[in-house]
Amino acid sequence: MNQRVVIFFLFVTTLILSCNSPYTYKKKGYFKIDFPEKKYQVFDQPGYPYRFEYPVYANVVKDSTFFGEVTENPWWINIDVPMFHSRIYISYKQVGKNNFDSLINDAYKMVYKQHTEVATGIDPIPIENSHNAEGMYFSLGGNTATANQFFLTDSTRHFLRGSLYFDATPNEDS
């Protein structure tokens, strides 16, 4: 019996010591993403009430349906970025035909009401430029379907809203 205890003790000790390897510190890291060279082209199509610059590796596509319905005006577009499997949905509304406060409230609802439960943080960043346009950029953290949304307006005639979506499952750590 005494011999069995000694053999068992030696076996367990050998097992524990043989499986131990020196700890190697691993730095936190992220995937290296090679971004293409920054080159832009101008979207300035006749009949559209807005213009902007977008990357040369992206495509602007007219958006003609909204959840199976016809869009309320012909100025809704999508900016597709195939190399990143992403799309920016752009909707445009005329302030004169819509209540300005209602447009602002809807933009905030699209960010906060739909994402508050799953977002780990929502960071609103004011936007101002020299063309009398202002708005808000929202950076959303966590398991949200979209990480970036924004709206721009001149508060009298134009209201433009956008949201960026990636064709991928959202992961909290990405």
Sequence positions of predicted segments:
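Sec-dependent bacterial lipoprotein signal peptides
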Residues: 1-21
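N-terminal targeting sequences that direct proteins away from the cytosol to non-cytosolic compartments
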Residues: 2, 19-77, 82-84, 101-102, ...
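Residues at beta-strand starts and edge strands
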Residues: 9-10, 48, 73-75, 84-86, ...
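Soluble periplasmic/extracytoplasmic beta-strand elements of cell-envelope proteins
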Residues: 78, 89, 161-165
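N-terminal segment of the mature soluble domain
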Residues: 79-90, 102-104, 108-113
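Second-shell loop/turn segments in exported
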Residues: 88-97, 149, 173-174
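Signature of long, low-cysteine stretches enriched in small and polar/charged residues
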Residues: 105-161
